């Protein structure tokens, strides 16, 4: 090379060593040779955040917080955090150790392999082959080491990492959007992080945990961690596709959004593109995966403005009751829900609706007191969902009280379909709420469905509406499990 080219080469190499963002831009062609690089402000922000953590760990300074990053899909998050960052960090200090994880072993290994492809590329070897190399006897797709004890281990959510430790623990999309619909999958991912992955730092006060993901459910890993006291232990970076929801974190990032359109990356996520995504993903998918708000206010299947608030109760109307019993009083499960309503002239008035967490004896004692308080008469009926303790509740109340109690039928449709069946009655304004402190909790759960943590109040509403549409349990009845 000529002196001019040698100088340019040396300057580029030095610049890449000094700045992870510059390394990201220069290494792009190695992993995406057919895709032109399009950069945006969030790339530099995330790169700078990771670089600061890397340099702090090298200096052996205590950390302030672990990190949660929520960004839309197709925003280059995995290439930055899981593919390129470990490679750049090894240039700075090849003794660093990484454990990375994704929702599937296939994806996790694919990302790990891309990191290794950079290391094996001619572009990289010309610049940093003298800094480190991959050991031949420790060179698997899911685990490889360099000649300075640096290690990269790729695992998946639910996978074992026994005996492994790292300076960086990276979780990249712990759930796919499809998996997020399963409470079991969500619980498994959250418990795996809490009980297995969380403890894998070599130095708990210095090493860092990094979670980068699109939001897919209110109870996904981000929601699980940010909903507890543990939120104080995490720096939360939230970059939604638009600034519509006021969900940008930290607030200082708001200045990077287009002042006219409110878009975070107009070149890739234009208004037209976002409209197409909204059509394809639906309201809930769009709210979570693009807006990073998986429980959008008043944008779900049930809207707040469908419900009128009444100041007066229908005094002469018969009050009926719906009971959706919980499996246990465990805080993790849905609570038991009780709903009182009247039905006159094809219109429902919800008199009261409460959530209670009570074991069987306390619940059986509570029910008679609550229904009497809410207007029970000899003409009233109490319908109990037969799941969990439902059958036993019916039997006990019939045996020990004079209440008119009836066991209902099991559901025949999925949750979304059951709500869809009653949506016309709701949207037409035929269901009102008697003014009370319970209104806000009730409306909050309804408007967040189906992404809300609990759906027991929704369950009761569906049962109440269907009860009158199809007539005293003789027709079609739909409600929640």
Where are these regions (language model features)?
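Walker A/P-loop
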Residues: 62-84
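Conserved nucleotide-state-sensing and coupling region of NTP-binding domains
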Residues: 101-158
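Acidic two-metal-ion nuclease catalytic site recognized across multiple nuclease folds
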Residues: 3-7, 465-481
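N-terminal accessory segments
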Residues: 1-65, 429
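ATPase catalytic-site recognition across NTP-hydrolyzing enzymes
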Residues: 252-325
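Conserved RecA-like ASCE ATPase "motif II neighborhood" in helicase/translocase motors
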Residues: 141-196
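Mg2+-dependent endonuclease catalytic cores in nucleic-acid-processing enzymes, primarily RNase H-like
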Residues: 223, 227, 231, 238-240, ...
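Two-metal-ion RNase H-like nuclease active-site motif
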Residues: 146, 153-155, 317-329
């Amino acid at each position: 090379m000529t002196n001019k080219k040698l100088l340019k080469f040396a300057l580029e190499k030095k610049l890449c060593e000094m700045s992870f963002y510059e390394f990201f831009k220069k290494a792009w062609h190695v992993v995406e040779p057919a895709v032109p690089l399009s950069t945006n402000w969030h790339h530099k922000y995330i790169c700078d955040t990771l670089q600061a953590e890397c340099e702090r760990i090298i200096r052996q300074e205590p950390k302030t917080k672990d990190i949660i990053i929520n960004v839309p899909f197709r925003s280059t998050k995995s290439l930055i955090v899981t593919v390129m960052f470990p490679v750049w960090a090894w240039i700075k200090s090849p003794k660093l150790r990484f454990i990375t994880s994704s929702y599937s072993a296939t994806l996790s290994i694919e990302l790990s392999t891309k990191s290794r492809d950079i290391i094996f590329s001619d572009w990289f070897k010309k610049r940093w082959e003298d800094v480190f190399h991959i050991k031949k006897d420790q060179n698997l797709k899911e685990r490889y080491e360099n000649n300075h004890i640096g290690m990269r281990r790729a695992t998946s959510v639910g996978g074992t990492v026994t005996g492994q430790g790292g300076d960086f623990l990276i979780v990249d999309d712990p759930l796919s959007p499809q998996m997020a619909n399963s409470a079991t999958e969500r619980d498994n991912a959250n418990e795996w992080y809490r009980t297995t992955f969380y403890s894998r730092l070599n130095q708990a006060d210095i090493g860092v945990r990094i979670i980068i993901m699109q939001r897919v459910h209110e109870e996904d890993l981000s929601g699980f961690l940010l909903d507890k006291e543990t939120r104080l232990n995490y720096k939360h970076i939230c970059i939604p596709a638009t600034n519509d929801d006021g969900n940008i974190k930290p607030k200082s990032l708001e200045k990077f959004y287009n002042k006219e359109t409110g878009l975070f990356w107009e070149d890739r996520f234009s208004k037209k593109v976002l409209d197409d995504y909204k059509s394809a993903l639906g309201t809930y998918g769009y709210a979570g995966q693009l807006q990073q708000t998986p429980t959008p206010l008043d944008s779900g299947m049930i809207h707040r403005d469908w419900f009128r608030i009444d100041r007066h109760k229908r005094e002469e109307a018969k009050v009926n009751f719906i009971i959706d019993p919980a499996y246990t009083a465990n805080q993790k499960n849905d609570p038991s829900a009780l709903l009182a309503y009247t039905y006159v002239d094809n219109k429902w008035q919800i008199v009261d609706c409460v959530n209670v967490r009570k074991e069987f004896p306390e619940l059986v004692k509570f029910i008679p007191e609550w229904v009497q308080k809410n207007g029970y008469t000899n003409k009233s009926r109490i319908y109990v969902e037969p799941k969990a303790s439902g059958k036993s509740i019916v039997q006990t109340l019939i045996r020990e009280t004079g209440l008119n109690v009836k066991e209902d039928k099991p559901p025949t449709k999925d949750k979304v379909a059951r709500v869809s069946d009653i949506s016309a009655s709701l949207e037409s304004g035929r269901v009102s709420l008697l003014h009370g402190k319970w209104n806000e909790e009730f409306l909050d759960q309804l408007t967040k469905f189906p992404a809300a943590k609990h759906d027991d109040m929704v369950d009761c509403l569906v049962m109440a509406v269907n009860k009158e549409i199809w007539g005293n349990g003789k027709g079609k009845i739909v409600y929640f499990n």
